[in-house]
Regions:
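The catalytic Tyr-X3-Lys active-site helix of short-chain dehydrogenase/reductase
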Residues: 116-119, 124-132
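Substrate-binding pocket helix/loop in short-chain dehydrogenase/reductase
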Residues: 69-70, 74-79
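Residue(s) in the substrate-gating loop at a strand-loop-helix junction
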Residues: 113
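A short, exposed helix-loop element centered on a Lys and neighboring polar residues
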Residues: 93-94, 138
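A glycine-rich helix->loop->beta "capping" turn
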Residues: 24-27, 47-60, 66-69, 105, ...
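The beta1-alpha1 cofactor-binding region of Rossmann-like NAD(H)/NADP(H)-dependent oxidoreductases
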Residues: 11, 32-46, 75
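Active-site-adjacent segment of SDR/Rossmann-fold oxidoreductases
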Residues: 118, 139-149
Length: 177
């Protein structure tokens, strides 16, 4: 049993998940703040603490794509993707890490990607952001150990709104639960 705060730039999907959780007897809230906005992240953390009293788990899973080959990519697209994936993870983690230290407990999950670990044509921005979170995860695992804070990374693959245009249609049947 746990409680869920679904946060992100688009509240519709999060609100649907919140409704499902509540309809099944759970507790959940949503927050449409962007992980790139310092004030929005602070408000998200305050809302979560106000509703649930503590933060035990943080899952960093915000994501966007702006795919183009590196020589054709604008710097604004590169920076935007890195800002969401890497700096969004940094900002949310930085906001909850002191809370978890004080609680002497915390679990942080960051999502990475095979694009960060191995590269993928047209995803230099995405790959840079996703590899950056791996470096941060490795360091925070060491720094958090004495406070019972565990930090891990997952490199999932799924059929989502973000990936549906990247995969062949037959992949949907294999990746939809």
């Amino acid at each position: 049993g746990g409680s869920v705060d679904g946060s992100g730039g688009s509240s519709e999907a999060a609100d649907a998940v919140v409704k499902t959780i509540i309809d099944n007897g759970g507790k959940a809230i949503s927050n449409g703040a962007s992980v790139t906005d310092d004030k929005g992240v602070a408000n998200m953390v305050e809302q979560t603490l106000s509703e649930f009293g503590r933060i035990d788990v943080l899952v960093n899973n915000a994501g966007v794509l702006r795919d183009k080959s590196f020589s054709n990519m604008s710097m604004s697209d590169f920076e935007f993707v890195v800002d969401v994936h890497l700096m969004g993870t940094v900002k949310t983690t930085h906001a909850v890490f002191p809370i978890m230290k004080e609680q002497n407990y915390g679990r942080i999950v960051v999502t990475t990607s095979s694009s960060g670990l191995y590269g993928n044509f047209g995803q230099s921005n995405y790959g840079a952001g996703k590899m950056g979170v791996v470096g941060m995860m490795n360091t925070l695992e060491l720094e958090g150990a004495k406070y019972n804070i565990h930090v891990n990374a997952l490199a999932p693959v799924a059929w989502t709104r973000m990936t549906e245009d990247l995969m062949p249609p037959e992949a949907e049947a294999l990746l939809t639960p």
